[in-house]
Design a protein with these regions (language model features):
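A conserved acidic beta->alpha catalytic loop
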Residues: 41-50, 101
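Acidic helix N-cap motif at the loop->helix transition within catalytic regions
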Residues: 16-19, 46-55
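Cell-envelope/extracellular polymer assembly enzymes that use nucleotide-activated donors
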Residues: 4-6, 36, 192
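Acceptor/aglycone-binding surface of glycosyltransferases and processive sugar-polymer synthases
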Residues: 69-88, 93, 105-187, 214-224
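Hydrophobic helical membrane-anchoring modules
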Residues: 1-2, 157, 181-259
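Short beta-strand/loop segment that forms part of the nucleotide-sugar
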Residues: 33-44, 67-68
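Short, well-formed alpha-helical segments that are part of the catalytic scaffolds
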Residues: 14-29
Length: 259
């Protein structure tokens, strides 16, 4: 059975890395699985858009295109833009691969193999799976992530081995009620998303990935990020509605422009 499958690539100030990402996709055996490759630029201040378009043309990657958010929606907002697009264009599945070249497109092969994805709502890449490979990843961040994964697993009664890697796949039917519009636009979007997945009793599994840090520039401010994580955790424990329902955010529009 064939499926209409979107590959979404969020990009922000990654002119060096996005070229490598596009090259890897163009040479991947998984390329034919994607009906469209949508690179969503979040108002980059460098030449991300220009170099991405140039690489797409040079490689004749016909199903790929670069668009740009109407405003800087942050990483979470870019996800909302892509999810809305996948729902409205009646895609069956949407995969996510960050444009900073930390993840590897070929890791999705574990999900495409024997069409495993047909049996689940969410397929989540895990940096901390026993079969995953971390390259140049700081030890203190490994331990910090393992700690928050453990806490999240305890409060959700689900085994959660990663609360937000940059490579995932979702069944679009699962996204149709647009629950994700309630979540923050910032880098904690994935925390809320994973907590919702666990709470909603969605079918999901984690798959191992290779994750590398080379010349990427992190946008994470550790202390403010940790504070927001604690707030999300408290809301999940004591007031799930405060975490999963945000009428103001649901009113916000998320649009992109073709370039």
């Amino acid at each position: 059975m064939s499926h209409k499958h979107l590959l979404f690539i969020p990009a922000y100030n990654c002119e060096k890395q996005i070229v490598r990402v596009i090259k890897k996709i163009s040479s991947s055996k998984l390329l034919t699985n994607f009906s469209e490759i949508l690179i969503i630029d979040n108002c980059s201040e460098d030449n991300t858009v220009e170099v991405a378009n140039k690489e797409i043309l040079e490689l004749n990657l016909k199903q790929a295109r670069v668009v740009q958010n109407n405003d800087n929606y942050n990483l979470g907002g870019s996800h909302k833009t892509a999810f809305n697009y996948a729902v409205e264009q009646k895609y069956d599945y949407v995969s996510i691969l960050h444009g900073d070249d930390q993840g590897d497109i070929n890791d999705l092969g574990k999900v495409f193999e024997n069409q495993v994805f047909e049996n689940y709502d969410c397929m989540l890449g895990s940096r901390f799976n026993r079969n995953s490979k971390l390259i140049n990843y700081p030890k203190f961040r490994i331990y910090a992530n393992l700690a928050i994964n453990l806490v999240a697993s305890i409060v959700t009664f689900k085994f959660l081995s990663d609360l937000g890697s940059g490579i995932n796949m979702f069944k679009v039917d699962y996204l149709k009620n647009k629950f994700y519009l309630n979540f923050p636009d910032d880098l904690t979007f994935n925390y809320s998303l994973i907590f919702y997945i666990a709470h909603s009793k969605a079918s999901f599994f984690y798959f191992p990935i290779t994750w590398s840090e080379d010349d990427q520039v992190s946008n994470v401010k550790l202390f403010s990020h940790a504070y927001r994580w604690v707030i999300i955790l408290i809301k999940f424990i004591f007031n799930k509605k405060a975490l999963f329902v945000n009428y103001e955010l649901r009113k916000k529009d998320y649009f992109f422009n073709d370039l």
